[in-house]
Amino acid sequence: MFDKNFDDMQSEEMREYFMQMNNPYYLYAKSMTDLYDEVYKPKTPVIENLLYSGTYLFVGAPKVGKSFFMAQIAYHISKGVDIWDYKVNKGTVLYLALEDDYARLQRRLYTMFGECENDNLYLATQSHQLNDGLDKQLEYFIGKHPDTKLIIIDTLQKIREISGDKFSYASDYDIVARLKKFSDNNNVCLLLVHHTRKQQSDDCFETISGTNGLLGAADGAFLLQKEKRTSPKATLDAVGRDQQDQRLYLEFNRERCIWELIKAENELWTLPDDPILENVSNIVNNENTEWIGTATELVTELGLDISPNSLTRHLNVNADRLFNEYNISYENTRTHAGRQVTFKIIPKETE
């Protein structure tokens, strides 16, 4: 439940911690100072600037082309092939195509990608519901395929149990929150395919079938929509906690059954270069794959005019940038001699 690092705790501190935990009225909270002193696991992109680890909704009207879109991104991620102008990080993909059969999937994939072998894309047409052990099935799959990046559930309704309160905010929020907990614990992306409702709204995301509880619990959502059902042109709107809001203009290639990018409505804002991170990348690289030392030693090594504490806090906050932009893992641990900083180059996957 909590992210307390027991390796960093002294015996007296640990005793006090467990005494507090035994108090039924104890409320666990962090001070702002403690928050800055933590290093959190990086949020890794599956498709950079578009899709990250976490739980997302992918919503559209029936037969608008959602399943073709799911097959397309599943293929690209499993093969490590960039999609449009977006960089893809390769990994195993599990696609629960619960409204399809294997014969239809075979025809669809062959039409889209031709005669192409792919041992990193797995497809299933049946699964348990969430209350009947789906999470255990997914955990088992990840155990067999630890490089799993993406799990697609097509559709969300297929894994929900039918009940009288199925359209309540509480039940909508609960099912997505449970799936989000799973994705966070396993550092994977869950993409939940869902339908829109017929009623229109000024906010396109309010057309998601069900209550606002679905979007409220999710890390983000994608909405695929057409002005005319017979038109090959569509827009894809994206919102989320870890990526910028976007609108992409797409066109469906009817011959190959794939979605093609026509244009993006706006250019994505990028973070400016960070001089401290740049300096770290100069001492940790393919020639020098590891650096271990104290924060004081690191200040000297980098030639910086800041305190060791300020440096480690800056690195704590930017651990995800080090990981995703510079391919460097970062640890900040307590030892008997004080705080120890460790940088390591992450080995790049070879084909």
Residue positions per predicted region:
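Pre-Walker A (Motif I) flank of P-loop NTPase domains
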Residues: 52-56, 91
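Short, small/acidic-rich helices and loops at N termini and domain boundaries
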Residues: 1-24
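Post-Walker A helix-loop "phosphate-sensing" segment adjacent to the P-loop in P-loop NTPases
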Residues: 76-90
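Conserved inter-motif catalytic segment of the P-loop NTP-binding fold
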Residues: 26, 33, 42, 46-47, ...
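Phosphate-binding/switch region of NTP-binding enzymes
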Residues: 57-59, 63, 67-68, 96, ...
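DNA transaction DNA-binding modules
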Residues: 249-351
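Detector for small/aliphatic-rich hydrophobic stretches
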Residues: 17-38
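Hydrophobic positions on the alpha1 helix immediately C-terminal to the Walker A/P-loop
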Residues: 69, 73
